[in-house]
Amino acid sequence: MFGLLGCTRYFESDKGPRVVLDKTDFVMGYHEHIGILAAPGSGKTTLTRLLCGLDAPDEGDFIGLRGDALPLGANSFILPGLTGEENARMMASLYGLDGDEFSHFCYQLTQLEQCYTDRVSEYSVTMKTHLAFAINLLLPCRLYIADGKLYTGDNATQLRMQAALACQLQQKGLIVLTHNPRLIKEHCHAFGVLLHGKITMCEDLAQATALFEQYQSNQATIQTEDYSFDI
């Protein structure tokens, strides 16, 4: 099993501790594909870092091992001074993988063509994202975590990435944190909502969407009231 038990995560601010996750529980099997609806600023990135073992909770327990989960959109490991190919081969070497096979997969998936041998510092944001996605797909892990979105690029690129991910997901789990119900409908079979620092699992996507939309409606009402005034 993998997840969090009674985990709290907070950050100090000028007004005191800001609680992002509040004694939340979230436990899943390694082959499950779970979509969690979460509004911007609700703690998606904080949750991702906890589940990937990058941060430790202030309270509670993390279930699993560091390296079990991989943040699918992470690109901080990409070195701008190296070429795309050199970055791919470097990561393959670090994990003891075949450099030729690893690099060939990244070249085919990204379709960077001649840019694959250019320095990453010359890449656009999208090109760098595609390279990172390809590399992440081949790194050893037991499940992927996507914070916000899964793919970028034109339709052809997204179809290639979707097919490559689907192949990996035959043996690996997936957690998608997003505000878009359509995204998790396509890729997940269990659904939840991140509200008020806690994850609430739902019976189906319809229930999760209704709960999420109700929360957004309530937040919009509160913001409107905050800006109301008498004339």
Swiss-Prot record:
A GO BP annotation: polysaccharide transport
Domain ABC transporter residue range list: 5-221
Residues noted as binding ATP in the record, renumbered to the chain: 38-45
One GO CC term, this protein: plasma membrane
GO MF annotation terms: ABC-type transporter activity; ATP binding; ATP hydrolysis activity
Pfam family, one: ABC_tran
Subcellular location: Cell inner membrane
Predominant cellular place of this UniProt entry's protein: membrane
Keywords: ATP-binding, Cell inner membrane, Cell membrane, Membrane, Nucleotide-binding, Polysaccharide transport, Sugar transport, Transport
Membrane topology type: Peripheral membrane protein
Similarity comment: Belongs to the ABC transporter superfamily.
Known role: May form an ATP-driven Vi polysaccharide export apparatus, in association with the VexA, VexB and VexD proteins.
Protein name: Vi polysaccharide export ATP-binding protein VexC
Species name: Salmonella typhi
Top-level taxonomy: Bacteria, Pseudomonadati, Pseudomonadota, Gammaproteobacteria, Enterobacterales
